[in-house]
Amino acid sequence: MALSSPVSPSLAKTNPASSTLDEGQRGSYWITTFGCQMNKADSERMAGILETMGYQEANAELDADLVLYNTCTIRDNAEQKVYSYLGRQAIRKRTNPNLTLVVAGCVAQQEGESLLRRVPELDLVMGPQHANRLETLLTQVQAGQQVVATEDHHILEDLTTARRDSSTCAWVNVIYGCNERCTYCVVPSVRGKEQSRLPESILLEMEGLAARGFKEITLLGQNIDAYGRDLPGITAEGRRQHTLTDLLHQVHDVEGIERLRFATSHPRYFTERLIDACADLPKVCEHFHIPFQSGDNELLKAMARGYTVERYRRIIDRIRKRMPDAAISADVIVAFPGETDAQYRRTLALIEEIGFDQVNTAAYSPRPNTPAADWNNQLSEEVKVARLQEINALVESTAKERNARYAGRIEQVLAEGMNPKDPSQLMGRTRTNRLTFFSAESPQGITHRAGDLVDVRIDQVRSFSLTGTPVIN
C-alpha cells in the first residue's frame, strides 16, 4: 500500500465524515491517550494541529465531532481496551455519520488496514510516525476516503505547536523509534527505527517553551540515551559528535527553564560521562528512570537486553556516588517465558538491594511479531497473577521506606496545578520526582500558583506521595 493511501477498492466507501471538515466548520475534537509518555507527547502535538485547523476541544467525548484514540500495544490489555472504546464509537457513528473517527499510535501501526475490516466505521488509521501529518491525512479523509498511513516515514521535525496539557512542564521529543530487539517488545516494529532530531531544532523548541512560561522540560525518547547514533559526525577524541550528554550541555542554559529531566534510559547506553554531566549540570534533576526488567542474567540474555545485573548495579552505584540523594525508578517484567522461581526471587532481591523509589511492574504479555510470543515455555496466568501481586507489595513497601527519609525535610517543589481533590492545595514534584501536595497559601500569607518553585517542609509521607507546608527560607 502506498504511503497514506486510500484503502483498497474492496474497503473503500464514500465518507460522510468529510462534511465536518469544511473550512470554518471544523467543530470539536476529543483525544483519548493510552500508554507511555511518548504517546502523551504525540497527543499534545495532534491536539495542537487540530486547534490550528479550527477545531475546539469538546467538553465530553460523546459531544465531539472528531474522536481520536492514540493507542498502545505494549500489552494485550491496553490493546483490548482500545477495541472496547472503538465499539462504542462505532455504534454512535451509525446514527451520526458525520462523526470523524481516528485511530492513531501503536495499535494503528500494528493492525493497519485490518483495523478497517474489524471496525469499518473508521475514517483514518495512522501510525505514530505520522502524528505530525494529521492535517494532511484529514484532508484526504475530506476527499471522501478511508485512509491508512502506516508506511515507514521520515518523521518531520517537531515544528507543530502542541496543545500542552500543563502550563508548567512540557515534553520535548528528541529521538523517535528504537533499534533494540528485545524479544518481548513490539515497540521497534510499531515505532520504527531511531530518528534523532537535530540539536538546533530541539533548542529552538525549548526556547519557545521558555518564552511561553514553561519551567520544566522532559526530553523524551523510547531509548533516549541512544540519542544521536543516527546523526553524522565524529569528534577529535573519536566519539560520536551527538550524544545525550552533549545535548544536555547544549540545552542546559535556556533562559527561563529551571529543570531538565529525560526518559526513558537503556542500561546498555547509560555511560559514566552521562552520569557525570547530570551531576555537574544544576538544572538536571536527580531522578533517573532506568528499566532493569529482570534480576537474573539468564533471563536478561533471553530478553536480549544486552547488559548484566552487574552492569546495572555499577550504573546505580555510580549515580549514587555522584548524587547520593538521587531517585531511581525502573520497569520490571515478571513471569517471562521460562522464568523459574529462583530467577523470580533474584528479581525480588535486586529490588530490595537497590532500594528503588518506584518500579513499574508488569506480568509478561505475549505480543505479535515478537520472538518470545512463540516460545513453548509460557507461564500460567495463575503464576503471573501471584508473582505480580507479590512484587507489587514489595515495590510499595520499598517506596514507602524510601519516602520516609523525606519526613521533616525541606524540599523544592515546582507547583504544577491545583490538587483536584482539595482546591486549597497545590500539587507538584520535587527534583527527585516525588508527587507533593501543599497549601496554596503559606503561613506567612504568600499565595503560590502553578509555575512557582516553592520550598515545602514535608509533614507526611505515603508510599507514592508527600504532603507538606510552604516555608520561607
UniProtKB/Swiss-Prot annotation:
Source organism, top-level taxon = Bacteria
Q: Where is the Radical SAM core domain?
A: 164-401
**Entries under SMART domains matching the protein:** Elp3 (SM00729)
The terms under GO molecular function for this entry are: 4 iron, 4 sulfur cluster binding; metal ion binding; methylthiotransferase activity
| Bound cofactor: record note | Binds 2 [4Fe-4S] clusters. One cluster is coordinated with 3 cysteines and an exchangeable S-adenosyl-L-methionine.
Question: Which residue numbers delimit the TRAM domain?
Answer: 404-472
Question: Which residues does [4Fe-4S] cluster 1 bind?
Answer: C36, C72, C106
Look up the record and name the cofactor or cofactors this protein needs: [4Fe-4S] cluster
Give EC number(s), comma-separated. Answer: 2.8.4.3
* Cellular component, GO annotation: cytoplasm
Primary location group = cytoplasm
Subcellular locations according to the entry: Cytoplasm
Family the entry assigns: Belongs to the methylthiotransferase family. MiaB subfamily.
Annotated protein name in UniProt? tRNA-2-methylthio-N(6)-dimethylallyladenosine synthase
